[in-house]
Every structure is written in C-alpha cells, then in structure tokens.
C-alpha cells in the first residue's frame, strides 16, 4: 500500500513538473505591424501595413439651407423656381457626406496615385403642378413618405489614377482653372469659364520646371460639355415657353473633346491658358434615318485665367479671374450648373398682359430641316476678391457675366418659330434671341476652429434679354408651373438668393 501510494504521488509530481517547465518555455511572439506615418506626400498619409503604399482618408460633412431657390445652390431661373408662385420652394435644405481615398506609391517611373471621392446627398423635395386644365388643377409633391429615398443620391465625384505623367479616369477638366466656377463663391451658377464637374479623360501632363506645366487631353463631352443642338423645325409652343428653341437633336458620341492647357503656378500666383475643340454631331432631321441629317461641325473654346496671391490689402488675400470665348462649345463659358433654358416670371405694366417673362436659350448649334448647323457664340468673364479680416473671418465679393449671340441665319430660324408659334407682337423686327446672363454676390465665412466653417452667401442674378421692350407673346397653359395660357410681356428679370452653410472637413 505504501509502495503504491508512493508511486502515485511520484507520478503526479512528475507530470506537474513537466507542465510547469513547458509553460515556462519561451515562445516567439508574432511580429506586430504598427501603422507608420508616411511623410513623403504631406500630412495625413500612413503606410498600409505590409506595403510601400501610402494612404490618406478625408472628406467632409456639409449642411446647407438655400433661400429663394429650388436648388442648392443655383439661380431660380427655370421650372417652378422661375415661376415665382406658390409652387416654388421658399427654402431648400441639403445634407451631404463626402469620403475621399488617396493612395500613393513611389515607383521607378515616378509616383503612382489613385484617387476616389464619393458623396451621399439628401435634398429637400419640390412641388410640381399636375393639373390638366386651368379649372381642374392639382398639385402633387414629388416625393411621398413611402418614396422619400428618391430625394437622396449617391455621386461619384472623382475616380482616376496618375502614373508617369498620365491621368486616366474621372478628374477635373484640364480646360478649367483651379478654382473652376468658384473664384470666391459658393454659388454654383457663375458664367465666365469652365466648370467644376469632373469628366472622364485621358491626359498627359508635362512638368517643365519652375512651376510651368502643359497638359494635352481627350475628354468625354457627353455628360457635361454639350448644351443643346436644336432643330428649330421641331419647336413647339410648350417648348418655346420654357426657352427651348427647338427639338434637341443630339446624336451619339462621335469624338471626345480635345483640350490643351499651359499653366504657370509660382509664389506670386497663377496664369493659365486653355483651348478646347468640341464636335457637334446632330442626329436626323425627322423621325428616321431616311430623312437625312446636317453635317458635323467642330466648335472651339478658349480661356485665360489669372490668380494673384498675397496682395497688399492683407495676408492671404487673393484675386481670381478668368475670361472665356466659345463658338459651338458653349459649356466652356456657360458651365454645366447654369440652366440651358431660362424662363423667369415677374410683374408687368403692359395692358392686357397677365405677367412678364424672360425667355432665353443656350445652344451649341441650331438648324432647320434640310440645312446645316449654325454655331452659337458666347463670351464672358468672372472674378472674385477675397479679403481676410482675421484668421477666423474672410469675405469675398464676386461676379460673372456671359453673353450668348446667334448669327443672322440662326436668328431667322428661331424668330420664324417665335413669331409664328407664340404670336410675338413686335414681329420679326422685335425678335432677338440673344441674351446676357450675370450674377454678383457677397460671401462671408467664419472658421471658429480648424476645418469647421460657417458661411453666408447672397447672390443677385440678372437676365438681360434682347427682345424689343414692351413686346408680348402668347404662351400656352403650363400646368407644371401653374401658369395660365395668356399674353406675357417679354422683359428682363432678376432674382435674389441666399445660401447658409456649415461644413466640417476632416
């Protein structure tokens, strides 16, 4: 018994000792890969663990409230906003969240970069008229509780990569200045230069030293760089009442826009010269291909941009300005956030007229059945002066002006439709579809802490139409904007809007 007990206790002690020794043996720990700061490309970059690629995450959250317009943030110059009646919005709100991802890798060919930016946006809905007659009219909200998601949208702003001097993907147009249509403003609808909206492109940029660069680009014209190609033979009373001077007769994409740009960016500021070639490719005269079509015509655009930094009025003060001229490529001056058809209503003093209206239409070209395209000319300028009152406060005064000019042949086409269809009281002698469009404004920004900014932007928009003063047209019933069929005076119009915004960048 004693022998058995001794053997049992000895066995337990042996196994216990073996367990203790095994636990005490050193074990090689798995290496921990800490995220390391990447200082090669500036603040905010980190190495992706296990790679030589640096990544930076960024974005912003923005909340806006626009007064006097149905858009955030454009002019009330068309649709229900231009109608200025009880259907329009007196305020429009919007919330937006933005995320951008920037990756960079050093290679033997230079830096390899990818950039992606997307936003989710939620905006106030609007009302449109849905009546079928002037007596039995009704109004319907564009979104209901069950379909409120229709007021939200996902947008892909940028998606491109850069390698060995090439930029491929959706990026800023090489034609546009660095500030695009925002020389100092938040207001979207400023004429006088190329716009912000990115485009798909294939671009080569040569860095020539001392801040001088040159770029050559082929870019998609479909989404943002074509306005209207009107077949005036298809003009209707309903279309003319909105500023559409014909049936929009754009054919499929045939050739990309070709852009060249030279830029000098140095400590004093920036100078840029840009040119673009734009093909106008119309569809058919009639309902099928047997009706024929006008020949293609190439248009072109040019822009000069200048930025002057650190002017004597204060540290950080800047002046940004640009001028543009186009022929058959109108979106390079009247950028994509400006309405291509304008119908703004107001009061009148003309006896027998129900109200006044300002009508205007933007195109790249116009034609009638059996004829060739007549290219539309535009020119304009924009600019802003920004003054820093303190590190927390700054203000900018800004403005833009653009002119649309139709040649005599195009005017004869358009005026034939306006006089015949809308019964223009002054006849052909009083008909002129040319117009000027301008906006001036003042914005003040307050940045109480880094990357948080509150701003107030007030803008005055003016339409200077060229029809003879006192002329009237007879417009049909327009249920969508609740306007009755009646005589309207053709008259210059204006509008005042205000944008309040809070934005936190990160």
What are these regions (language model features)?
Residues 35, 66-93:
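Surface-exposed strand-loop-strand hairpins of Gram-negative outer-membrane beta-barrel proteins
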Residues 44-67, 86-237, 252-270, 308-310, ...:
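Outer membrane beta-barrel
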Residues 1-74:
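N-terminal periplasmic/intermembrane-space "pro-region" immediately following the signal or transit peptide
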Residues 40, 92-98, 156-158, 197-199, ...:
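Transmembrane beta-barrel architecture of outer-membrane proteins
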Residues 267-440:
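Detector for outer-membrane/organellar transmembrane beta-barrel domains
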Residues 70-77, 126-138, 144-145, 151, ...:
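Outer-membrane beta-barrel translocator domains and adjoining extracellular loop/strand segments
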């Amino acid at each position: 018994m004693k022998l058995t007990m001794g053997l049992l206790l000895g066995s337990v002690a042996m196994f216990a000792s073996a367990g203790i020794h095994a636990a005490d043996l050193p074990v090689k720990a798995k290496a921990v890969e800490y995220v390391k700061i990447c200082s090669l490309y500036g603040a905010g970059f980190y190495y992706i663990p296990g790679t030589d690629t640096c990544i930076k995450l960024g974005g912003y959250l923005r909340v806006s409230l626009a007064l006097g317009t149905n858009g955030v943030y454009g002019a009330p110059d068309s649709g229900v906003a231009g109608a200025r009646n009880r259907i329009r919005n007196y305020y429009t709100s919007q919330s937006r969240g933005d995320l951008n991802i920037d990756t960079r890798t050093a290679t033997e060919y230079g830096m390899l970069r990818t950039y992606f930016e997307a936003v989710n946006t939620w905006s106030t809905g609007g009302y449109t008229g849905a009546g079928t007659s002037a007596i039995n009219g009704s109004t319907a909200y564009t979104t209901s509780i069950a379909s409120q998601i229709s007021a939200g949208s996902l947008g892909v702003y940028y998606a491109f990569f850069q390698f060995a001097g090439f930029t491929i993907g959706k990026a800023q147009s090489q034609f546009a200045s660095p500030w695009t249509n925002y020389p100092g403003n938040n207001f979207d609808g400023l004429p006088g230069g190329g716009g912000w909206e990115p485009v798909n492109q294939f671009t080569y940029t040569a860095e020539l030293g001392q801040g001088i660069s040159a770029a050559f680009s082929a870019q998609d014209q479909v989404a943002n760089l074509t306005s209207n190609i009107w077949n005036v033979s298809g003009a209707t009373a309903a279309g003319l009442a909105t500023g559409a001077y014909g049936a929009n007769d754009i054919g499929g994409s045939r050739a990309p826009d070709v852009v060249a740009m030279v830029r000098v960016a140095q400590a004093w500021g920036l100078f840029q010269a840009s040119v673009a070639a734009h093909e106008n490719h119309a569809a058919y005269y009639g309902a099928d291909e047997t009706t024929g079509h006008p020949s293609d015509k190439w248009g072109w655009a040019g822009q000069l941009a200048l930025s002057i930094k650190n002017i004597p009025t204060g540290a950080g003060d800047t002046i940004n300005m640009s001028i543009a001229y186009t022929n058959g490529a109108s979106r390079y001056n009247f950028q994509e956030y400006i309405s291509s058809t304008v119908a703004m209503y107001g009061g009148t003093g003309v006896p027998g007229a129900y109200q006044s209206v300002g009508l205007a239409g933007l195109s790249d070209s116009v034609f009638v059945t059996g004829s060739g395209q007549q290219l539309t000319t535009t020119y304009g300028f924009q600019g802003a002066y920004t003054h820093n009152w303190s590190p927390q406060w700054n203000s900018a005064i800004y403005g833009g002006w653009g002119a649309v000019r139709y040649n005599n042949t195009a005017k004869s086409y358009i005026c034939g439709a306006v006089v015949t269809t809308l019964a223009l009281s002054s006849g052909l002698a009083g008909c002129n579809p040319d117009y000027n469009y301008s906006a001036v404004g003042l914005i003040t920004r307050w940045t109480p802490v880094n990357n948080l900014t509150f701003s107030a932007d007030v803008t005055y928009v003016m339409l200077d139409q060229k029809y003879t003063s006192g002329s009237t047209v007879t417009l049909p019933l327009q249920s969508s904007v609740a306007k009755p069929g009646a005589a309207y005076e053709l008259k210059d119009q204006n509008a005042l809007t205000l944008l309040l915004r809070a934005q936190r960048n990160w």
